[in-house]
A protein has these predicted regions:
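Catalytic alpha/beta core domains of metabolic enzymes, predominantly
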Residues: 138-145, 152-233
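Active-site beta->alpha loop and helix N-cap motifs at the rims of alpha/beta catalytic domains
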Residues: 2-157
Length: 233
């Protein structure tokens, strides 16, 4: 199959190696988001050797935040960390227009990549429907590399990762790979092998199974526990 994967997107993604912190969204004592915490948070991660963050994903409680809150948190990260920490913005939403709006905003504030989880409501009937959903979000993000966030444990639709990759390389010009959060080793191995043939990247997302991800060939991982990293000795 002829692919339409953008080589620039892949090169930017391949520059992200090692642990990527899926960052928490800070809240104050009254339960409001607190973007003012982000500079200290970013400095802690920099001092611990973390070179990239995944903002407003499941760890960041994105689906419990308003669109305005998600925009505000992402802006705090880009204003604080752009140029010193690479930023992947999660823009997924069950409301496709909201996801598209967040993708446009992510592009405007200069993130390094965009990602979205599969919808958990109004599920796609087949792989093509699912990839068309992601293609619309990716198009709103214009030239930003795009990662599909596979996390079937959240109850969303799930198809074999290799099938998603095969469709995405021909339907999403900026497609750069997957954030794979599953405990299925066979699916992971197939996805890694296929990603390599297309010059893509699989980011392993199940922290507790990191060793199996490394054994399967992943060279980078996105997870909440990497944000707890101690300062290197």
């Amino acid at each position: 199959m002829k692919t339409t994967v953008d080589s620039n997107s892949c090169s930017e993604i391949h520059a992200m190696r090692g642990p990527i912190a899926a960052v928490h969204t800070p809240f104050d004592a009254s339960g409001r988001i607190d973007p003012g915490v982000v500079p200290a948070y970013a400095e802690h991660l920099r001092s611990a050797g973390i070179a990239a963050v995944y903002v407003c994903g499941s760890t960041g409680e994105s689906l419990a935040l308003t669109t305005a809150e998600r925009r505000s948190i992402l802006e705090a990260w880009t204003e604080t960390a752009a140029g010193s920490i690479r930023i992947i913005a999660h823009v997924g939403s069950n409301a496709l227009p909201e996801a598209e709006e967040l993708a446009r905003h992510a592009h405007e504030v200069g993130v390094d990549a965009i990602s979205a989880m599969n919808p958990t409501f109004g599920r796609a009937r087949n792989v093509d429907d699912l990839v068309r959903h992601h293609a619309r979000i990716a198009a709103a993000g214009e030239d930003r590399p795009y990662l599909v966030y596979e996390i079937s444990a959240f109850g969303g639709v799930s198809f074999p990762a290799a099938e998603v990759i095969e469709r995405a390389v021909s339907m999403i010009p900026g497609f750069a790979g997957l954030k794979f959060t599953s405990s299925d080793p066979l699916q992971l191995q197939l996805a890694v092998a296929l990603a390599e043939t297309h010059g893509l990247r699989i980011f392993f997302g199940a922290d507790e199974n990191l060793l199996s991800g490394l054994a399967a060939g992943c060279v980078s991982a996105i997870g909440s526990t990497y944000g707890y990293a101690a300062e290197p000795a």
